[in-house]
Amino acid sequence: DTADSFMRWMLLGPYHPEVKQSVARIQRMHNSVARSFPESFSEEEDFIYSYAVFTLTSARMREVAGAPPRPQTELIAVHHFWRDISEQLHSTSGRPSTYPSTVEEMVSYADEIESREYPPTPDGRIVSNAMIDQFSDRYFRGRLKPLGRAMILAFVSDRVQHRQDVVRANPVLVYAVRKAFRAYFFLQDHVLPPTRRPFSVLLQSEEWKDMRKEWRTAEVSANPNRSGLNREPIKTGAEAGR
């Protein structure tokens, strides 16, 4: 539900009435689950690290692909966006007190967490591989499935892959993916014209609604036994290391 809401949050802004209502609903869901599993949403660090990942992913992808960075002002804007969201969506301990005040501090925050030594966990392996497989099953079915795994792991550090004990991707495909993204970023920056259809208009279109409906139907068909919040959350990353 949180991921499904991201686009509208970004388009409307963190203090738009619809966004505040949506964020409050997610916070209530977290609080409800926390009554049964209090450790799942109690750590401020887990939330701030997630916001750091959301902020830095695009810049890190460009760096790994060997593409020039986007203007720093874009990173600052994203950093401010998640800062404002973090005031509304946070751990059960309350609003964050350690949110990095600058992009540079956020980079250091993420690097420090990712440099810690956590032993691989069975749960981490299960969750990581399941997420990669879900992506591959949706976009790269059949013989193309290894390409889906390579597309994800091309931008995941060796340290994190080792920690989560994921099934490694074909190194040749990883190399090809990085080169393809470098070319894409070049085209995006220097060749392709800006889109003439605002993304906000696309999200309101029947075309987008039909696409989302098709995705959800495919997910249910692929996993008819999928359940909601009635199972114990699986711990990964920093949470699993504690």
Q: Which residues fall in each region the model found?
A:
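Mature, function-bearing regions of proteins
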Residues: 1-242
